[in-house]
Amino acid sequence: MGIKLQNLVVKFGDFTAINEVTLEIPKGKLISLLGPSGSGKSTTLFTICGIHKPYSGKIIFGDRDVTGLEPEELGIGLVFQNYALYPHMTIRENIGFPLKNLKWNKEEAAKRILEVAKTVKIDGLLDRKPSQLSGGQQQRVAIARALAKRPDILLLDEPLSNLDTKLRVETRQEIRRIQKETGVTAIFVTHDQEEAMSISDQIVLMKDGAIEQVSTPTDMYLNPINKFVASFIGSPEMNFVNLKVKDGIGVIDNYIIKNITKEKKNVILGFRAEDVEIANAGIGAKVDTVEILGREKLLTLSHNNRIFKVLVENTFHIEEGKGIYIRPKEGKCYIFDEKTEGFIKKC
């Protein structure tokens, strides 16, 4: 079942938390609502599931207008970051709780509990209590419970935030597998761009209650529509430099960029850490720190009160405190308007 949001506005008193959000989520896809704290991603999710009520606009599931309905009227599955498992119940009872409320036949309920437990790979844990499970296993129980009643839509609010790094990676892979196997339409809320990039069919990047960009992870990384998107997507963050342009040319130290814009205007140059060459001349900087990341090293450079991040091969040797020249690779520079911060071109 697909989801449509049409000009959705959510207010808390005089504060507008969601401002004219329009979005279409295709049936059977997993999309991530991504953004910094306060961007409106969780508020959007809670409005879709009926916890918050919209000030205006519409929410449509399939061809059904569900605007303003209560959560229990929507037939959706919900997974929260705190798992919300009942500690006195077994895993079997936790998974079956929504089926009991829906008055499922006991035999059919037992069959469904085992079915979803196998789907999330916890069928050997059904007679344990939540306290006997790891964080990752508890999260799988929460997902199984959400899927038990066969929802067409699954909503997950920061479901991995309480897990350690290794478990986060494993569990997000499991969520993706489960979503593909079941074909459920899923919305995954996260502030972690790595999670969103790895799990999503599409990313919806939000800021200040509005959508900045909707696209596939690869397209958002390669083709950001503004400086905010470029800075939020990618690790480390994109490097930025303000440039004065004259006759289409911008200069930083001995590094010259041509054909920037025909207009006489100031722009912002952006380039990613992996798109930099070490050179004999170019942008001069001092090496502040060298971090070993395995196959690569991350250099933190200082240049005229600016900080640049540069990735180099592990075999490249340079000492902290030394000088270095760098050049952004041709065709890998992003030009943004200084005033609007909108994307202009690559060069």
Residue ranges of predicted features:
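Conserved ABC transporter NBD signature motif
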Residues: 57-65
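ABC ATPase nucleotide-binding domain
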Residues: 4, 24, 60, 325-327
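ABC ATPase nucleotide-binding domains
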Residues: 30, 71-81, 85-228
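The feature captures the beta-strand-to-loop junction immediately N-terminal to the Walker
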Residues: 34-36
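Helix-to-loop junction immediately C-terminal to a conserved catalytic motif
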Residues: 49
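ABC ATPase nucleotide-binding domain helices that frame the ATP-binding cleft
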Residues: 42-45, 141
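Non-catalytic connector elements of ABC transporters
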Residues: 236, 249-347
